[in-house]
């Protein structure tokens, strides 16, 4: 068996990726979230596949087909809520994974980092089109508001929006194509994840100390397979608690009402994992400016490798940048809170301050703190 896994063309790839992979001996539990994201993707694809067997992408029957899944299909309620809450778990793991990458300087591995940003954007797109499918009030109005943002693009905006809608409003054509996108995108995410791993294994993982670990590597199996299994069991425990005890806690009550184009909800807001970007969008009074800020709020992650001037790897020995990093995390939480609040004083003002702070920390404060720390090292 040992000879087979090292020589067989297919098993050799698996062996080099998950068994004999040389891994730093000191990586902490923060490195577990990559495998947890893989687990979340598997859960989402499997539950989504079973949901797709019973779902109908037609405006007249979409809402009732979701109700039918929950009421009449064997364990349909469980599959539906595993899928809905699985998306939340996916984004929790994703945010922690990106946060760990920023803290420990993983953005230095630029190819892996940039593929990760593409994965992040693709996952957000998948979640957005998926949120439209139950065809509740918030699904419909969320789709209308977010797709309508493209009309801010000069010259081609209106045509582009009508092209995406497949008509002059969000209707049957929109729902059908969103279902098609939602079905295919997870498989594209899986393909990108393999490319992400490919680039990671070219350079090897970094580690919490930020020091070169070439002289201190251990095989991935059994040490980290056991560690990842513990993480997977804990993830499943949290997901099952969420699904079985609090299935609707992260959903929107408006989505229990079928979509009605003639009745606008009091506060249109996306799912919780988009609220930080939604708050940035709303904080700019100009429509085109808001859309650009929304896109930049994610794409600015690509600036980390370019703005990095530090002579050290990661933040473990950099107290000044550590403080700025935790202010950045707190600021993100404030943006998430503001995104779910109505557009009125004082929330608009807090949102504008938090949005400016978000970009200022990445573009100004972190590079300045890097320079300060480099000068301290010279002393």
Curated annotation (Swiss-Prot):
Gene3D superfamilies: Cytochrome Bc1 Complex, Chain C. The gene is MT-CYB. The cytochrome bc1 complex contains 11 subunits: 3 respiratory subunits (MT-CYB, CYC1 and UQCRFS1), 2 core proteins (UQCRC1 and UQCRC2) and 6 low-molecular weight proteins (UQCRH/QCR6, UQCRB/QCR7, UQCRQ/QCR8, UQCR10/QCR9, UQCR11/QCR10 and a cleavage product of UQCRFS1). This cytochrome bc1 complex then forms a dimer. Heme b b562 binds at residues 83, 182. A ubiquinone binds at residue 201. It comes from the Eukaryota. This is Cytochrome b. The lineage of its organism: Eukaryota, Metazoa, Chordata, Craniata, Vertebrata. It is found in: Mitochondrion inner membrane. PROSITE patterns: CYTB_CTER (PS51003), CYTB_NTER (PS51002). One of its GO terms (molecular function) is ubiquinol-cytochrome-c reductase activity. Changing residue 39 to T: In strain: Isolate MVZ 174229 and Isolate MVZ 174230. Belongs to the cytochrome b family. Component of the ubiquinol-cytochrome c reductase complex (complex III or cytochrome b-c1 complex) that is part of the mitochondrial respiratory chain. The b-c1 complex mediates electron transfer from ubiquinol to cytochrome c. Contributes to the generation of a proton gradient across the mitochondrial membrane that is then used for ATP synthesis. The chain crosses the membrane at residues 33-53, 77-98, 113-133, 178-198, 226-246, 288-308, 320-340, 347-367. Its cofactor is heme b. GO terms for biological process: mitochondrial electron transport, ubiquinol to cytochrome c.
């Amino acid at each position: 068996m040992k000879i087979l896994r090292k020589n067989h063309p297919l098993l050799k790839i698996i062996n080099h990726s998950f068994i004999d992979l040389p891994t730093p001996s000191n990586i902490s539990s923060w490195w577990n979230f990559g495998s947890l994201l893989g687990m979340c993707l598997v859960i989402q694809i499997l539950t989504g596949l079973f949901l797709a067997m019973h779902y109908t992408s037609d405006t007249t029957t979409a809402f009732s087909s979701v109700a039918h899944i929950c009421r009449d299909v064997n364990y349909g309620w469980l599959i539906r809520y595993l899928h809905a809450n699985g998306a939340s778990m996916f984004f929790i793991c994703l945010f922690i994974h990106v946060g760990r990458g920023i803290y420990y300087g993983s953005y230095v591995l630029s190819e892996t980092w940039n593929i990760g940003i593409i994965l992040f954007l693709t996952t957000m797109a998948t979640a957005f089109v998926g949120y439209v499918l139950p065809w509740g009030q918030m699904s419909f109005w969320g789709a209308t508001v977010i797709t309508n943002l493209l009309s801010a693009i000069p010259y081609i905006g209106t045509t582009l929006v009508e092209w995406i809608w497949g008509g002059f409003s969000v209707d049957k054509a929109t729902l059908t194509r969103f279902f098609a996108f939602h079905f295919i995108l997870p498989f594209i995410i899986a393909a990108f994840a393999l490319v992400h791993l490919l680039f990671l294994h070219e350079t090897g993982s970094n580690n919490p100390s930020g020091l070169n670990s070439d002289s201190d590597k251990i095989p991935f199996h059994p040490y980290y397979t056991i560690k990842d299994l513990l993480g997977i069991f804990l993830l499943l425990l949290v997901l099952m608690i969420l699904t079985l005890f609090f299935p609707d806690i992260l959903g929107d009550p408006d989505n229990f009402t079928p979509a009605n184009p003639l009745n606008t909800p009091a506060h249109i807001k996306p799912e919780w994992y988009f609220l930080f970007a939604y708050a940035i969008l709303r904080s700019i009074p100009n429509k085109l400016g808001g859309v650009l800020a929304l896109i930049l709020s994610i794409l600015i992650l690509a600036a980390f490798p370019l703005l990095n001037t530090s002579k050290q790897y990661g933040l473990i020995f950099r107290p000044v940048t550590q403080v700025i990093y935790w202010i950045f995390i707190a600021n993100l939480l404030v943006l998430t809170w503001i995104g779910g609040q109505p557009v009125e004083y004082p929330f608009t003002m807090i949102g504008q301050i938090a949005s400016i702070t978000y970009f200022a920390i990445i573009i100004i404060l972190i590079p300045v703190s890097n320079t300060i720390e480099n000068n301290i090292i010279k002393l």
